[in-house]
Amino acid sequence: MAVPKRKKSRSTTRHRRAQWKTTPTQLVEIRVEGKVLRVPRNLVKAYHSGLIDVED
């Protein structure tokens, strides 16, 4: 693991950490059992194969 050569100030550390941002999940429209759903792209196969039930 990397070892820092110099101490980082609390301000610098917090400024760096504050830059991390989340991105919203990309939703795609699919049709399952006659219903149009907006689901995450990585779950499309699971919905089509029936691994995830479609709730009303």
UniProtKB/Swiss-Prot annotation:
| Disulfide pairings | none
Q: Which UniProt keywords apply?
A: Ribonucleoprotein, Ribosomal protein
This protein's superkingdom?
Answer: Bacteria
Identify one Gene Ontology CC term for this UniProt entry. Answer: large ribosomal subunit
What biological-process terms (Gene Ontology) are attached?
translation
Show the segment(s) annotated as Disordered: 1-22
Q: Which residues form a coiled coil?
A: none
Which InterPro entries does its entry note? Ribosomal_bL32 (IPR002677), Ribosomal_zn-bd (IPR011332)
Q: Name one Pfam family in it.
A: Ribosomal_L32p
Q: Which GO terms describe its molecular function?
A: structural constituent of ribosome
Where is composition skewed (Basic residues) in this entry?
1-19
- Name the NCBIfam families for this protein: rpmF_bact
Q: Which family does it belong to?
A: Belongs to the bacterial ribosomal protein bL32 family.
Q: What is this protein called?
A: Large ribosomal subunit protein bL32
Biological source species: Cutibacterium acnes (strain DSM 16379 / KPA171202) (Propionibacterium acnes)
Query: Could you read off the lineage of the organism from its UniProt record?
Result: Bacteria, Bacillati, Actinomycetota, Actinomycetes, Propionibacteriales
Gene that this sequence comes from: rpmF
